[in-house]
Swiss-Prot record:
GO biological process: light-independent chlorophyll biosynthetic process; photosynthesis
Function, in words: Catalyzes the formation of the isocyclic ring in chlorophyll biosynthesis. Mediates the cyclase reaction, which results in the formation of divinylprotochlorophyllide (Pchlide) characteristic of all chlorophylls from magnesium-protoporphyrin IX 13-monomethyl ester (MgPMME).
Protein name stated in the entry: Magnesium-protoporphyrin IX monomethyl ester [oxidative] cyclase
Known catalytic reactions: Mg-protoporphyrin IX 13-monomethyl ester + 3 NADPH + 3 O2 + 2 H(+) = 3,8-divinyl protochlorophyllide a + 3 NADP(+) + 5 H2O
Family membership noted in the UniProt record: Belongs to the AcsF family.
Pathway(s) per entry: Porphyrin-containing compound metabolism; chlorophyll biosynthesis (light-independent)
MF terms (GO), sorted A to Z: iron ion binding; magnesium-protoporphyrin IX monomethyl ester (oxidative) cyclase activity
Species in which this protein is naturally found: Prochlorococcus marinus (strain MIT 9215)
Cofactors required: Fe cation
Annotated TM spans: none
Key words, A-Z: Chlorophyll biosynthesis, Iron, Metal-binding, NADP, Oxidoreductase, Photosynthesis
Top enzyme category: oxidoreductase
Entry's EC annotation: 1.14.13.81
Record Pfam families: Rubrerythrin (PF02915)
Gene: acsF
Length: 390
């Protein structure tokens, strides 16, 4: 991707970058991880599958797919102000999310290329895809006289640290949920072309295949992880400061032993599935319903379809998945959405900050309770869940 596709071209683009640099729990985050642990990963258990996936990446099926055509000319001017605002918000979030993936994958490919070349090459190919997506979205923003300052975001947005295994869980789910989100929108608009508010959606069918291949890579990578890990690192980072001692190696061994224990793997599977599903559902139902309505979609039905399909797909790699069919699953998520509306109403009031905080405490407790109950729902064993997909 050429550098010009991600650089700001006007004053407005800089402002957009600064706005999105402000983190909230529902905005796309930027991530970093333990690069030393990543470069020491032994892939031999599943190297053949990883090599096959890397060969698929090398073919770059979408190399010539993301080419704008005449349909884009004047398309932005046809949108009414309300739909325009909704679509620009969608473009901002999507572009930031894709760029976040690019930064993580690119940094991984650079840091581990000397000691783990196969893994580094896979990450480099995925960084290529994510950069292409972000650049294409940013060009659509330019149709509206805006462009994200991705360079500003790179330098100023906070980075959240996750250990490698957590990155694998979260990114696998995110890539697979991205596939189902894009293909669901594409298929809907294929049957209901009157909802196609912008030509960008014509590209979603091939686009989602990139997401699917990325998810397959993380599937293969998780299968490649051994039950025991040799010397990992004698370093530990606390509050941004790095400390070195030989004993820290045993800490890392114990941590990796726990992460690879079957019982702990089940807990992590449930945690990350719930985290990704709840974030998407709460965001969409709380602030994105009008956008989906503009496409002719019912936001609740759309989210339920995407969550159910992603949950089903995740049964191929995780030992357990969430029981999304339990009557209380979406009911509890809806309760959190309603609590979000109550929080917004409190923020609109002219009360003093202390009164606002006190008013919010019961709502936060309610949200925590609902999430805990969702986490404690008896999961579905992947061996018994939709065996036809395995």
């Amino acid at each position: 991707m050429s550098k010009s596709t991600i650089e700001p071209k006007n004053k407005k683009s800089v402002n957009r970058g600064k706005e999105i640099a402000k983190d909230t729990i529902l905005t796309p985050n930027f991530y970093t991880t333990d690069f030393e642990a990543m470069e020491k990963m032994d892939l031999s258990i599943n190297e053949d599958e990883l090599e096959a996936i890397c060969e698929e990446f090398r073919k770059d099926y979408n190399r010539h797919h993301f080419v704008r055509n005449k349909e884009f000319e004047g398309a932005a001017d046809k949108l009414d102000p309300e739909t325009r605002e909704l679509f620009v918000d969608f473009l901002e979030g999507s572009c930031t999310s894709e760029f976040s993936g690019f930064l993580l994958y690119k940094e991984l490919s650079k840091r581990i290329k000397d000691k783990n070349p196969l893994l580094a090459e896979c990450f480099a190919h995925m960084a290529r895809d994510e950069a292409r997506h972000a650049g294409f979205l940013n060009k659509s923003m330019n149709d509206f006289g805006l462009q994200l300052d991705l360079g500003f975001l790179t330098a100023n947005k906070d980075y959240t640290y996750f250990p490698p295994r957590s990155i694998f869980y979260a990114t696998y789910i995110s890539e697979k949920i991205g596939y189902w989100r894009y293909i669901a929108i594409f298929r809907h608009l294929e049957k209901n072309p009157e909802g196609k508010i912008f030509p960008l959606f014509n590209f979603f069918e091939n686009w989602c295949q990139d997401e699917n291949r990325h998810g397959d890579f993380f599937d293969a990578l998780m299968k490649a992880q051994p039950r025991s890990v040799k010397s990992l690192s004698n370093k530990i980072t606390i509050g941004g400061s790095t400390f070195t001692h030989p004993l820290f190696d045993y800490f890392h061994r114990f941590r990796y032993f726990l992460n690879n224990h079957p019982f702990v793997s089940k807990l992590w599977s449930r945690f990350f599935l719930l985290a990704v599903f709840a974030t998407m559902y709460i965001r969409d139902q709380g602030t994105k319903k009008d956008f989906y309505s503009a496409l002719g979609l019912d936001a609740r039905e759309y989210d339920q379809f995407v969550i159910n399909k992603t949950n089903e797909t995740s049964a191929r790699v995780f030992p357990v998945v969430l029981n999304v069919f339990d009557d209380s699953f979406y009911r509890r998520l809806d309760s959190i959405v309603e609590n979000g509306k109550r929080l917004s109403e409190i923020d609109k009031k002219d009360n003093q900050n202390l009164n606002k905080v006190l008013s919010k405490i019961p709502i936060f407790i309610s949200n925590g309770y609902q999430l805990l109950r969702l986490y404690l729902l008896k999961p579905l064993d992947s061996k018994d869940y939709q065996p036809s997909i395995r």
